[in-house]
Curated annotation (Swiss-Prot), chains A, B, C, D, E, F:
It comes from Arabidopsis thaliana (Mouse-ear cress). The keyword Secreted applies. Keywords: Apoplast, Disulfide bond, Glycoprotein, Manganese, Metal-binding, Secreted, Signal. PANTHER family: GERMIN-LIKE PROTEIN SUBFAMILY 3 MEMBER 3 (PTHR31238). May play a role in plant defense. Probably has no oxalate oxidase activity even if the active site is conserved. Belongs to the germin family. This is Germin-like protein subfamily 3 member 1. Is the most highly expressed of the GLP genes. InterPro entries: Cupin_1, Germin, Germin_Mn-BS, RmlC-like_jellyroll, RmlC_Cupin_sf. It is found in: Secreted, Extracellular space, Apoplast.
Length: 208, 208, 208, 208, 208, 208
C-alpha cells in the first residue's frame, strides 16, 4: 500500500514532465504555420486517433471516374502535428487521378485492388512510369507532377500516405481552368491556344 | 525546327538548375545522418521508385504468429531522403506484433484484412486502444510504445507508413530479453523477477 | 546629441525588424505542435531564462530510491521554442531510473556525483552499457530504451539535457502496469505471464 | 608576448570546437539527401561565397523571350548546406517565365527593372496575381504553380531567392510535352486533346 | 452542364483537403515558436503576398550613412510560415552596415547599385571579405558576424534575403553600447577599456 | 528450441529494418551539411557514446582566467547526427568567458560550482543578466551575444549543452582582433577608434 502511494506520487511527478506526445487539432482555432492548436490532453479519446472514412470507395460517378478521399488534419484531427496524413484513391474503369502535385509532402502509394499506371516527372524532365499490381508500392517525391490511371478493366483502389499532416493537393487542370485566371494569362504561360483554354474553362467552370 | 532548338537549349539550361528531387540510396556507401549518398540521377530507373515485397503475406509460422515486412531505405532505396517508408503487417489467428516503438517516426496504419486491436500508451501513461476493421486508419505518435493484435479468428493484415525513411523498430521483448543485457540489470530496471527474466531470455535466445 | 537622436531612430527602426529570438511560453494558452504561444517580449524578464529547481536533490524516498526533476517547457517556460530542456537525476544507494524512453529527443547525461551505470539498447538490439564517474558524459539516441542505476554505495546525481523543449518521458513499467491497459493485452504483447502482470499492476496501482 | 601566447593557445583550443559554419560543396562527390559533401575548410576562399553570374541579363533570344539564370548549389557551391539559393529572371518584351513550380522551396521575387505580372494558384484553386514595379517584392509559397510575364513594353528583370540550396524547377510545358511521356497519358491526365498534345510535343521536342 | 456539376463537386471535395499552402500572419494574435497564427484563407488577398516598401531608398541621413529596410513577417505578413524574408540596404557614400549577426538565418545579398565591400568572420576566426559590383551575389552563413560597407564614391544598394521569416538582427555596437548593460560587464567581456565603452555608450544612448 | 529458432529468425528479419538509431562520426571522411558519415554499426562500441574529457577543469592559466572544453562532434564522435553537444566552462577567480555567440544552437547552462554572472542581449537590444548559483540553469537563445563571468572569489564551473552536434563558437574579440581583418574595416564597422583596435590586435595576435 505504502509502496503504491510512493510509486503513484512518483508517477504523477514524472507525468508532469510528459506533454505533447500528440496534438489533436482544435479545428475551431486559427491555424499556425506548424498546424492547429491542440485540444487539451484530458479531452483526447482513443477514437481521436482513428479515421473511418477510408473504408468504403469514394464516389466515382464523375468526369474522371475516380475519387480522392482525404484524411488530412482537417478531416482527421488526431494527426495534427504528427507529420503524416493519408488518403484513399478509387478508380473506376477508365478512371484517372489527373496530373497533380502535393506542394508540401512526398507520397507513398500502396495498391489495394486492380491495376494502376502511375508516374511522375522530375525537375530534370525525366519520366518515371510504372504499372502496379495490388501490394506494390510506389513513392512520389515531394512537389513533382504525378498521376494515377486505372490500367485494368475493373475498379482499382489505393491508399496513399504523405509525410505532412497538410500535404496540399494542386490539380493541374483545376489550377489552370477552374478559376478566374484570365484566359490570356493561361495561354501566355502554357502555350496552349485560347480555344483549348476556353473550352476547358467551360467544362471545368472557370471564368475569365 | 529553329524553335525547337531554342527551346531545347532553354530546356537544358534550366534543367541544369534542377537537382535532387530524389536521392536513390547507394547502399554500398557509408550512411550520413541524413541518409545514404545518392546514386547518380542518370542511373535512376522508374523501378527504383517501386517496391514489390509487400504484395504477399510475410511468414507467420513463428512464435508470434505474425510478420513485419519492412520497406525502409535499406530495402527500398528509392525512398532514401524522401522522409517516408512503409511496411506490411501480417497477423495469423492469435498473431501479435508485440509491444514496440519506432524511435524516429510517427506511424499511420491502414487495415487491409481482418480485425486488429491496436493501441498505444502516452508519456502521460494514458492508454488508447481501438479495434479496427478493414479500411480504418489509426495513427501512432512518434516514439510511443504500441502494439497490434489479431482481434478476429481469421488472418489480418495492414499496411503501415512512417514519416522517416529509417523509422527504426525497437521490440520491447527483444530489447530486454534477446541480447546480452545482464539479468541483474533487466531485473533492476524493470522490476520483473529474475526467474521471469531468465525464462524469457531462454526463449528469446538472450544471454547474461 | 543630434548623433544620438539619429542613432536612436536607427536603433528603433532596426529593432522593429527583430522579433522572436525567444518565445517564453504562455502556459495558459493552448499548445501548438511547435510549442506554447509566446508571452509578449515586453513582459519577458531575465528571470524567465533561469530555472532554480535543479539545485537540490529530488526526494528519493520511494520504491526506486531515485528522483527525476524535470525542467521542460511546462516547468521552465523560458525554453519554449528553443529546442532544449533539462532535468536532474538523483539516485540514492540502490536507486534506479527504470527502463524508459524519451519519444521526442536525444539526451546527454553529465554525472555530478557518485557512480552511475547507464545503458541503452539499439533498434538492432545491441546493448551499450557503461559505468560513469563524475564529469563523464554519455549520450542516448532519440527514442531508445535506456536506464540509469546507482553503481556505488553513496548517492549519485546527474544533469541531463534534451534537444527538445518537450522530450516526453515514457517509463516502461508505468506504461505496462500503472494504467488500465487490460492484463490480457499486456500478456499478449509482452509474453509476460498473467501472474507477473497482475502482481506489478498491484504494486503500481494499475487496473484491468 | 606571454599574454599573446596564452591567448593564441586559447584561440586554437576554442577554434577546434568550431566547425561547419558552412559547407562549400565538393561537386565531384556523390550528393546526400542534405546536399553535397563539404570541401575542407582550409581550401575555402572568400570567392567561394560570391557568385558573379547574375550580373548580366540571360539570353532571351528564344521562344519564351525570357531567361532564368540559376545560382543553385550546382552553380554556386558556397551555398551548399546553407538553405538558400538565388536566380535571375530576364524578360524581353513579350517574355514569359511559363507556369512552373519549385518542388522544394518558397520563393521571394524582387523586381529589378521593368514591369512584371506575376501570380500563383493555391491548392484551394484561388488565383493571386499582381503586376509589380521595380523594388516591389512578391512571395510564392512552396510547390505551387506560378508564372512571371513581362507586363511592359521594355525589358524586365528580377532577382529571386529560394529557401533551399536545391529548390528544383519544374516547368509545366516541359514536364508535359518535352519528354517521352506518351501522348495517351498526357491526354488522359490533363484532358487536353491529342492534337494539342502532339503539336506541343512537336514544338518542344517531345516524343511518344 | 452535368459534367460541370460533377467536376465542381469533385473540385470542392478535393479542395477541402487543401489547406495551409500559406499562413498570412494575424499580427494581433500572440506569436508561436513557428510564427504568427494565420488569418483565414478567405480573407487573404493577392496584395498580401506583395510588399512595396523596398522600392525606394531608406533614409541614410544618420551616423552610419546607411539604412536597413526590413520586410520580415512583422512588416510583410504574407511570408509568415514560408521560411523566407527580405530587406533592402542603402549605403550613402561612406555608409556602413555595422558588424552584425542574424541569429536565425543565412543571408544572400544581391548588389543593386554601387560597390559594396562585404565580409564575414567564421567560427574558426577566418576572414572572408570581397568587394562586390552590381549583380554580384554573396552568401553569409547563419549567425556569423558580418558587415557591408560602401566601397565607392556614390550611393550603393542591395537586396538581401534570409531563410527565415524572422531572421533577427543583432547589431554589435547596439548590443554592447546602446542599452543598460553595465560598463563593467562590457569591459570585462570585451577587453575594451572603460573610457572607450563609456564614450560609445554616450554616443549610442546607452546607460550603466 | 524450435521456438527459439523461429524467434531468432524473426529477430533478424526485423533487425534488418532497423538502422541509424545513431551515426558515430567517421572523422576521416568529408563532412556533409548534416554531419560526418557514420562508421559501420558493427564497429560501434559502448565507449563511443561516452566522453571523459569534461571531468577535470580546463587550464585557466591564461588571459581570461577561464577555459572552455568542448565535446562537440569533432571531439565526441558518438553524438554526430544526434543534434546535441556539450562543453565544460571553468572560471578561475576573475575569470570570464568573453562575449560570444553560437551561430547554430541554443544553449542550456548548469552551474556546477561557484557563482557565475551570465547574460545575453536580444535582437531587440534588451539585456538579460543573472547571477547564478550551483544547480541553477540558464538558457541562451540561438545566435545571440552572451557571456559568463565569475561572480565569486573562488573558482566556478558549469556544464553547457547545445541543441546541435556542431554549435559553432564565435568569440567577439577573436573575430574582431585576432585575425587579418584590416584595422580600417574593424574601425569602420564597430566605431571603435584605430588605436583601440590596433592595441587589441597586438594583444590577440591579429594583423592588418
Amino acid at each position: 500500500m505504502l509502496r503504491t502511494i510512493f510509486l503513484l506520487s512518483l508517477l504523477f511527478a514524472l507525468s508532469n514532465a510528459s506533454v505533447q506526445d500528440f496534438c489533436v487539432a482544435n479545428l475551431k482555432r486559427a491555424e499556425t504555420p506548424a498546424g492547429y492548436p491542440c485540444i487539451r490532453p484530458i479531452h483526447v479519446k482513443a477514437t481521436d486517433f482513428v479515421f473511418s472514412g477510408l473504408g468504403t470507395p469514394g464516389n466515382t460517378t464523375n468526369i474522371i471516374n475516380a475519387a480522392v478521399t482525404p484524411a488530412f488534419a482537417a478531416q482527421f484531427p488526431g494527426l495534427n502535428g504528427l507529420g503524416l496524413s493519408t488518403a484513399r484513391l478509387d478508380l473506376a474503369p477508365k478512371g484517372v487521378i489527373p496530373m497533380h502535385t502535393h506542394p508540401g509532402a512526398s507520397e507513398v502509394l500502396f495498391v489495394l485492388t486492380g491495376s494502376i499506371t502511375a508516374g511522375f516527372v522530375s525537375s530534370a524532365n525525366a519520366v518515371y512510369v510504372q504499372t502496379l499490381k495490388p501490394g506494390q508500392v510506389m513513392v512520389f517525391p515531394q512537389g513533382l507532377l504525378h498521376f494515377q490511371i486505372n490500367a485494368g478493366k475493373s475498379s482499382a483502389s489505393a491508399v496513399v500516405t504523405f509525410n505532412s499532416a497538410n500535404p496540399g493537393l494542386q490539380i493541374l487542370d483545376f489550377a489552370l481552368f477552374a478559376n478566374s485566371l484570365p484566359t490570356e494569362l493561361v495561354v501566355g504561360t502554357t502555350f496552349l491556344d485560347a480555344t483549348t483554354v476556353k473550352k476547358l474553362k467551360g467544362v471545368l467552370g472557370g471564368t475569365g
